[in-house]
Every structure is written in structure tokens, then in C-alpha cells.
Amino acid sequence: MLAKRIIPCLDVTNGRVVKGVNFVELRDAGDPVEIARRYDEQGADEITFLDITATSDGRDLMLGIIEAVASQVFIPLTVGGGVRALEDVRRLLNAGADKISMNSSAVANPQLVSDASARHGAQCIVVAIDAKKVSAEGEAPRWEVFTHGGRKGTGLDAVAWAREMAQRGAGEILLTSMDRDGTKAGFDLELTRAVSDAVPVPVIASGGVGNLQHLADGIQRGHADAVLAASIFHYGEYTVGQAKQFMAEQGIPVRIGS
């Protein structure tokens, strides 16, 4: 079985790492280069950088930050936020990103995912899906895709959208539960499992990690291939090394050491 990955996530706005609850109430968590270096030293498998206000503010790509991080950090970097065209994908890859994450732009122009995958390979195209439960109590569970940092509903069904994105050439799905984001209540395992079981590509579970058991649950009960977390790592509650140790003790295959 392939090793399961632990991925710290750095939400960036105006050049600083921030963390919020349910996509709002942002608080400062530090300098992206310093934080990325710390996670590299702790044994993170990858790091994800998301410029969470680039699309809604109409800002350009964070090329300078990515160049600075890539010069000091030697694990794969996934970068998203403000990617609107094929040229943006190329510029971020040239700046040192290994994978490019698309969210709002994939909804606005699904062909961009197909084109980027055809040109650069599925292995470096990630589609990020921010999903919110919209079914009523007692109904079959349904989740809607939101864009623009969670501010705009799309009417798209999250499971069907994930399936379409995989068919169009996304090599990975980064799935965030908006209901759980920043709450520390654990992943939305029902959502994670529904998407993981529906697509043939790896799914990264995101949104809601409050302890190490939640990470293990994302893999074992949510069927995710990787787990992403922010708060528990940023504020020093746990290290990536402790998370890997815990998961190994639960019988989950992880990479420990170089």
C-alpha cells in the first residue's frame, strides 16, 4: 500500500500565513518561508500554499513567495489561488511549484483543467473543491461546491464535480469541508468517503482537524489518500513527526525519516 501523506496547509493573504474558522475570522500565523522550512524539517510529505483572497480580490499570483520557499524547501509544493489561465500554471511551475491547484477557475472554465493536464501532465494538476452540506436532515446527503474563498455558491454537486474533474485530467482532488474548516471537530467523513469512493484519483481530506485521531480517521474512515491540516501544526499543538508516529501506530503506512 502506498504511504499516506501528511500535508500542512498554508493559507496566505497579503504575503502572510493566516488561519480562520469556516473561511472567515482570519488571524495571523506567521511568515510563509519560515513556516514552510519548519514543516520541511519536521518531515512533511508536501506543503500546500493557497492564496485565499487572490481570486476574490483579483490579485496576481504569489510568485515571489513561491520562489523564496522553493529555494529553501525541498519537498513538493502545491500552489493555488489566482490561477486563471494556462499561462498562470506555467509561471507557477517555473517559480518552483510542483503542483498547481485550481478551484474557482476550474468552475468558471472546466476546459482549463483539461488543457493544463494535457500540457503539463495530470500529476501536477490538483482541483480544489470547497464543499458545504446542503441536504436537509433525513434527506440523502448532498454537498454543494462553493468558489471565491467559499463566498459563492455554484449549484454544482460536489461528488459529481469531483468525478468530472478527474475525467478531465485532474491528478488529485483537494477536498475541503466548509462546515468543518477551522472548527477542530474532525473531517466531514461522510463527504470525504463519498468523494474518495467516487473518483479514481487520490483525494486529500481537508477541513476540521483538531487532533491526531482526526488525521487517522480521514484515511481509515474517510478513505482519503492524504490528510491536510493547518491550525494544529501552525500553533505548535503537534508536529508533523508526532502525527506520522501516531498514524504509524494505527497501522497506516507513512514515510518516516528520509
UniProtKB/Swiss-Prot annotation:
UniProt cross-references to PANTHER family, sorted A to Z: IMIDAZOLE GLYCEROL PHOSPHATE SYNTHASE HISHF (PTHR21235:SF2), IMIDAZOLE GLYCEROL PHOSPHATE SYNTHASE SUBUNIT HISF/H IGP SYNTHASE SUBUNIT HISF/H (PTHR21235)
Protein keywords: Amino-acid biosynthesis, Cytoplasm, Histidine biosynthesis, Lyase
Encoding gene (name): hisF
Organism: Ralstonia pickettii (strain 12J)
GO biological process assignments: L-histidine biosynthetic process
UniProt KW Cell inner membrane keyword: no
Stated name of the protein: Imidazole glycerol phosphate synthase subunit HisF
Quaternary structure (record): Heterodimer of HisH and HisF.
Catalytic activity from the UniProt record: 5-[(5-phospho-1-deoxy-D-ribulos-1-ylimino)methylamino]-1-(5-phospho-beta-D-ribosyl)imidazole-4-carboxamide + L-glutamine = D-erythro-1-(imidazol-4-yl)glycerol 3-phosphate + 5-amino-1-(5-phospho-beta-D-ribosyl)imidazole-4-carboxamide + L-glutamate + H(+)
Localization (cell): Cytoplasm
Pfam families linked to this entry: His_biosynth (PF00977)
Catalytic site: D11, D130
Entry-linked NCBIfam families: hisF
EC primary class: lyase
Family to which this protein belongs: Belongs to the HisA/HisF family.
Domain of life: Bacteria
Gene Ontology cellular component annotations, sorted alphabetically: cytoplasm
Principal place of residence: cytoplasm
